[in-house]
């Protein structure tokens, strides 16, 4: 450590370093070693929840706990403290006549933030709080910086996101939110594994962006002297596995899109994609409903959920509506009759729908109408199906009306939560769609995909009829934890330097 760094330390940091050195001089490692616990705070509270002070005294049971010192009070020969572990907090009752003199000195000199191990009798105070009456204390690790203000936690948003470790220490609500996220993902895995799906891993580095309409991050591979992109989806590699005969696969992983940031978008995020051979979009619709309802039940229990004051009936069957019917219901404009692109553009101008240069078909106009007028009305879980071919380059055409595809998106609280379709398995049609996307890219559509010839070649070997699905894990977590910004469900959201 440089002298310059020492000079920058504040008084509290200097005192903590002096205590660190004092521990070392006593032969105590300031940063400790392994420690065996017999229970955590939650296990103790559950085990002894119905025991009175007198009953606990009769039981005379001991426990060994460990955690971070969060509060400490007292003077003379008696002290109280709270120890925080992964499950919560437990109170400590420390008397000088119950521990050794050296042990009591460890307690007296311990700072908030230090880690200690405690062995002692399980008791209940006169105030009724379950506590550990210490008989032995072990110093485990020294905290060289003071914690955030202990009663209110962090309040500065920038610090919360940049220093998530401090947020987790001081804000139990935030800590529990991320535990819920992990449990939600585990339950999704459990659900799919129970349906005989196989979890797989596919590359993050791609030669060509594909599988979604999004702008990629470009990087460079030095050894091969080639530019590569970070994946914007896992779709095309997963469908190659269907070609290879795996039949039921899924992947949960990070996706990277070089686009804007807002309350529901981060440049890197987590998605799950699922593919099932011999299935269509209706089968996948049922699967999607099952995944989300199972995850919701696992972390929120039965019944509807509350999201920002709105009751979401996530436990009931999801509404299903064709995109054209949804547009007609909201705007009165009917796109079922066939029309020219000029007629569609005239309707768009009449309704003041923003138009882009690459909107060269009726399908583009239909999609624009939907985004402009319908999305904001979809509060309860709703499957919108029948997207136009022009905006669905990887979806199979509907056999009864080839202007549309067997595709759906799931909307809840006006936001998209899932995208799925009967997969296009005709390599000739797929190449034609890729070429149309490449043309749109030339016309200024930054989100249009290029041509993935390797994927087309894979399809030429034959892919069975297949249904595929993508779900945004982060948005689903936002819904199930009642949060309004994606940064609150990402442990380390993207931040400016």
UniProtKB/Swiss-Prot annotation:
GO molecular-function terms, A-Z: ATP binding; catalytic activity, acting on a protein; lysine-tRNA ligase activity; magnesium ion binding; transferase activity; tRNA binding
Covalent S-S links between cysteines: none
Catalytically driven reaction(s): tRNA(Lys) + L-lysine + ATP = L-lysyl-tRNA(Lys) + AMP + diphosphate
UniProt keyword list: Aminoacyl-tRNA synthetase, ATP-binding, Cytoplasm, Ligase, Magnesium, Metal-binding, Nucleotide-binding, Protein biosynthesis
Domain of life the protein comes from: Bacteria
E.C. designation(s): 6.1.1.6
Protein's cellular compartments: Cytoplasm
Enzyme class: ligase
Pfam family, one: tRNA_anti-codon
Similarity annotation: Belongs to the class-II aminoacyl-tRNA synthetase family.
Subunit structure: Homodimer.
Name recorded for this polypeptide: Lysine--tRNA ligase
Species name: Streptococcus pyogenes serotype M5 (strain Manfredo)
Origin organism lineage: Bacteria, Bacillati, Bacillota, Bacilli, Lactobacillales
Gene field: lysS
């Amino acid at each position: 450590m440089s002298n310059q760094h020492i000079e920058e330390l504040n008084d509290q940091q200097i005192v903590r370093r002096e205590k660190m050195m004092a521990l070392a001089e006593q032969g105590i490692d300031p940063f400790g070693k392994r420690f065996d616990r017999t229970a955590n705070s939650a296990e103790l509270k559950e085990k002894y929840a119905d025991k009175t002070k007198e009953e606990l005294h009769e039981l005379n049971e001991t426990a060994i706990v460990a955690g971070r010192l969060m509060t400490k009070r007292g003077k003379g020969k008696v002290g109280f403290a709270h120890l925080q572990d992964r499950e919560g907090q437990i109170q400590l009752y420390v008397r000088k006549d119950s521990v050794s003199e050296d042990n009591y000195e460890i307690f007296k000199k311990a700072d908030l933030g230090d880690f200690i191990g405690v062995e002692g009798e399980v008791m209940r105070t006169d105030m009724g709080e379950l506590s550990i009456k210490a008989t032995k204390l072990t110093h485990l690790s020294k905290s060289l910086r003071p914690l955030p203000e202990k009663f209110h936690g962090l309040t500065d948003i920038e610090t919360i996101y940049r220093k998530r470790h401090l947020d987790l220490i001081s804000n139990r609500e935030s800590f529990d939110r991320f535990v819920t996220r992990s449990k939600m993902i585990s339950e999704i895995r459990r659900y799919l594994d129970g349906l005989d799906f196989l979890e797989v891993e596919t590359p993050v580095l791609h030669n060509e962006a594909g599988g979604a309409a999004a702008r990629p991050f470009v990087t460079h591979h030095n050894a091969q002297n080639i530019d590569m992109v970070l994946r914007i989806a896992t779709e095309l590699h997963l469908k190659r596995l269907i070609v290879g005969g795996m039949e039921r696969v899924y992947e949960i992983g990070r996706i990277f899109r070089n686009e804007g940031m807002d309350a529901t978008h981060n440049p890197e995020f987590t998605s799950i994609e699922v593919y099932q051979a011999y299935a269509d979009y209706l089968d996948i619709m049922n699967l999607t409903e099952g995944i989300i309802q199972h995850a919701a039940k696992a972390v929120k229990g039965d019944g509807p959920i509350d999201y920002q004051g709105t009751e979401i009936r996530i436990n009931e069957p999801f509404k299903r509506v064709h995109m054209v019917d949804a547009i007609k219901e909201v705007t009165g404009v009917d796109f079922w009759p066939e029309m020219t692109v000029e007629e569609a553009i005239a309707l768009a101008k009449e309704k003041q729908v923003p138009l882009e240069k690459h909107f060269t078909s009726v399908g583009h106009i239909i999609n624009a109408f939907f985004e402009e007028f319908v999305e904001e009305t979809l509060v309860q879980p709703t499957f919108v199906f029948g997207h136009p071919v022009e905006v669905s380059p990887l979806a199979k055409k509907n056999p009864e009306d080839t202007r549309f595809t067997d595709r759906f998106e799931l909307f809840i609280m006006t936001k998209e939560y899932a995208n799925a379709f009967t997969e296009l398995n005709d390599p000739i049609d797929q190449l034609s769609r890729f070429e149309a996307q490449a043309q749109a890219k030339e016309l200024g559509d930054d989100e249009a995909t290029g041509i993935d010839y390797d994927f087309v070649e894979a399809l030429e070997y034959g892919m069975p009829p297949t249904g595929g699905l993508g779900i945004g894990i982060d948005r689903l977590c936002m819904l199930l934890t009642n949060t309004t910004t994606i940064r609150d469900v990402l442990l380390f959201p993207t931040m400016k330097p």
